[in-house]
Amino acid sequence: SLEIKQGDRICILGVNGSGKSTVIKLLLRFYDVDEGEILINSKNIKEYDVCNLRSVFSVVFQDYINYSFTLRDNIKITDLENAEWTDEDAIKALHIVDADNILKKLPEGLDTYIQKIFDRNGYEPSGGEQQKIALARAVNRRCKVMILDEPTAAIDPESECNLLNNLKHELYGKTLIFTSHRLSAVHLADKIVLLENGQVKEEGS
């Protein structure tokens, strides 16, 4: 069993196929558990409306998607109803995920299209840059619970260190659940869970 309290930062470690991504999909109710139960605030997860449940989480999946929109719209898409949202919010989100250099190199700044489409002069981000854009979108959503599946898998070690330190500061008091196979990401967590064959093998701080 595993207990996660409000404000915890949980790192789920394990080799490929150990069940890390499955834990995330169960929390988001992509499917339900066959045995046992998942409780949120002492209430069975199956009793929550799926849409309302998912609205609580800000999520970046391992197979994240960026859109053929401008950089601004790629970040803002998670916060479309916020009339007070400004470009500064996008710039702040990019800074938190150590992506200032992406913005600096874009020919039209936030108005630059991500991916080249039709007759527009877009920008083709690298794998690490794509991951940072997806992370910036999640940060912009500002949910109380953030779930990240292998959030730095495509990012170089130096940038990973900056990103993780920024996230640690930004997410203070919020709940963070993230998976990783890199030990370098462990310092972001205050609790570490080791999975093996879908079972909690070890747990500690």
Where are these regions (language model features)?
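ABC-type nucleotide-binding domain
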Residues: S1-S205
